[in-house]
A protein has these predicted regions:
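A short glycine-rich, Lys/Arg-flanked "PGG" loop and its adjoining helix->strand segment in the class I
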Residues: 98-113
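Conserved class I S-adenosyl-L-methionine
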Residues: 113-140
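Hydrophobic beta-strand segment of the Class I
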Residues: 85-86
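C-terminal lobe and adjacent flexible extensions of AdoMet/dcAdoMet transferase-like proteins
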Residues: 178-229
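Class I SAM-dependent methyltransferase SAM/SAH-binding core
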Residues: 20, 24-75
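Conserved catalytic loop of SAM-dependent methyltransferase domains
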Residues: 159-190
Length: 229
């Protein structure tokens, strides 16, 4: 279920900043099919911020306006049919995080986009989470560094296009908490990051260079057989 702390003052301010960071991406230019895996906040917290016509939300349990309840590591979708996959703290909250990332990669179309939200372990929020016995961000099974996340994305064939750190706010419920405005604090004291990555198209290449005008001694079938991806 959804962590209850998202409903208090700390969580509500976090959600507002995450919505703003998401809106700033202008993802309507990314394609026609948007898929969110996992709920964060309400079921429409992010989907109503996009102008993409076809938006879908898949979760592992029924909550609000869910389009489909399914295992996130076995998506009932055809491969390469989604233009944008959005993971709002999804990998942080499930044990099978790499399987979920692999399933996301499979459904993203060629040159499609993956957007991920995560908590920054090197931040006041990360420190409070560790010192609280991992109870502060309840429902979070792990904190994933930007370096680790981008490493996974590259391994799955993505090109990281943008990393945005935000929400430099002291994690307290008091109404007078102060945002950390000074640039010297960023990005290391920002609570959250958003990664935008593009699925790379790997071109077909010939095993040996083709010399114009030189007669080829092998058949077309043999040449095609030597092509690698």
């Amino acid at each position: 279920m959804q962590p209850l702390w998202l409903l208090d003052s700390i969580g509500s301010r976090l959600i507002i900043d995450e919505q703003q960071a998401f809106s700033d991406l202008s993802i309507s230019s990314f394609g026609n099919y948007f898929l969110q895996l996992g709920i964060w906040g309400r079921s429409n917290t992010f989907t109503h911020k996009t102008h993409i016509k076809n938006c879908f939300l898949i979760a592992t349990y029924s909550f609000g306006e869910i389009d489909l309840v399914a295992d996130l590591d076995h998506l009932p979708l055809q491969d390469q049919t989604i233009d944008v996959v959005f993971l709002p703290h999804t990998l942080e909250r499930y044990l099978n995080y790499l399987e979920i990332l692999r399933a996301s990669n499979n459904v993203i179309s060629e040159s499609g986009t993956l957007i991920a939200l995560g908590f920054n372990p090197i931040s006041l929020w990360g420190l409070r989470h560790w010192f609280s016995g991992k109870e502060f961000l309840s429902g979070t099974k792990r904190l994933i560094s930007v370096n680790q996340y981008t490493h996974w994305l590259v391994d799955f064939g993505f090109r990281v296009e943008k990393i945005h750190y935000f929400h430099a706010i002291i994690p307290q419920r008091k109404r007078y908490e102060l945002p950390l405005k000074n640039d010297m604090f960023n990005p290391f004291l920002c609570a959250c990051y958003m990664i935008t990555a593009r699925k790379e198209m790997i071109p077909l290449t010939l095993e040996k260079p083709f010399i114009k005008g030189k007669r080829q001694k092998t058949s077309l079938v043999d040449s095609m057989g030597r092509m690698t991806i």
